[in-house]
């Protein structure tokens, strides 16, 4: 069964056209037009691990639930549970992209602050589903320091060691950072509702200048993590961060912790891409060892 047939069964409508979309580095993405007038976004990942799209769909629904930030609605999801012949897929409502307006960045900052303030029941995920291409664990943890150490830094240290991308001395430094999070991590905070992979490519702007969040690695975490990701890869204006801080001020010393929260994504990228990410990850790790 091809993807078009799977979509027709899931959406109870005939696919009249499908167009491949560029930009995804993991899944194959498509725009599909249906005979009932709907246009949808669909993607498939033929070598995805078990539960890949179900996890993403749950994350999207969790971010969407408080109704404080725009997140595309999930129309259908399958991880191949309808039969081996049916490709796995995730179908979302279509967002017509446009250009940012004068208030786009500030509006996103306020919306993200509101999202974080809705909170999470734990650090991690209650459903314990792993996220991301590296399958990082999300076991529920009572504190951020325990979560970041046991569910991010230490698993990444093992992956980096196995891949050989980081020197043994840097792996030891990373393990030392995991042990020092109570010292370098700032004051304790309650778990925030995080997007978890918030770089510029995971934000769409529609024709009204409204920001939409996509492709999350959603979990309960430290709100500084989302903001550190946004600063790491760019794509967000200073008006966004200023509006966030006005709505939800950060604890003293947050500037000195930005690189701490960037360690995890930098190591992930070092493992995946090598190159300059290896040096950037090493620099961040050595800063907090």
What is each residue range found by the language model?
Residues 2-4, 8, 82-83, 120-193:
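An alpha-helical support segment within catalytic cores of ATP-dependent transferases
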Residues 142-149, 158, 190-193, 200-259, ...:
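Active-site Asp-x-Gly
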Residues 21-146:
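ATP-binding pocket architecture of kinase catalytic cores
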Residues 259-267:
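Hydrophobic alpha-helical segments that form the core
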Residues 12-19:
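Conserved N-terminal boundary motif of the eukaryotic protein kinase catalytic domain
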Residues 80, 97, 154, 211, ...:
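Activation segment
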Residues 269-289:
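ATP/Mg2+ or Mg2+-diphosphate-binding catalytic cores
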């Amino acid at each position: 069964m091809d993807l078009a047939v799977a979509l027709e069964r899931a959406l109870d409508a005939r696919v009249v056209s499908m167009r491949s979309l560029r930009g995804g580095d993991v899944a194959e993405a498509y725009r599909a037009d249906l005979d009932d007038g709907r246009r949808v976004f669909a993607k498939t990942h033929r070598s995805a691990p078990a539960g890949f799209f179900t996890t993403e769909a749950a994350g999207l629904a969790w971010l969407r639930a408080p109704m404080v930030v725009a997140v595309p609605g999930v129309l259908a999801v399958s991880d191949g549970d309808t039969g081996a012949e049916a490709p796995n897929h995730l179908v979302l409502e279509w967002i017509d992209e446009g250009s940012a307006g004068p208030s786009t960045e500030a509006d996103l900052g306020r919306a993200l602050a509101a999202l974080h303030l809705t909170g999470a029941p734990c650090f991690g995920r209650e459903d314990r589903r792993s996220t991301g291409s590296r399958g990082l664990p999300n076991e529920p943890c009572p504190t951020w320091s325990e979560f970041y150490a046991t569910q991010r830094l230490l698993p990444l240290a093992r992956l980096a060691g196995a891949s050989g991308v980081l020197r043994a001395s840097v792996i030891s430094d990373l393990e030392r950072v995991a042990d020092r999070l109570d010292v370098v991590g700032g004051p304790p905070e309650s778990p925030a509702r995080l997007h978890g992979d918030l770089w510029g490519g995971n934000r769409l702007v529609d024709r009204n200048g409204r920001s939409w969040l996509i492709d999350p690695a959603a979990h309960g975490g430290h709100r500084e993590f989302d903001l550190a990701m946004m600063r790491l890869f760019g794509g967000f204006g200073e008006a966004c961060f200023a509006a966030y801080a006005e709505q939800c001020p950060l604890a003293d010393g947050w500037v000195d912790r930005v690189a701490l929260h960037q360690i995890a994504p930098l190591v992930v990228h070092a493992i995946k891409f090598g190159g300059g990410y290896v040096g950037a990850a090493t620099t961040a790790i050595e800063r907090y060892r």
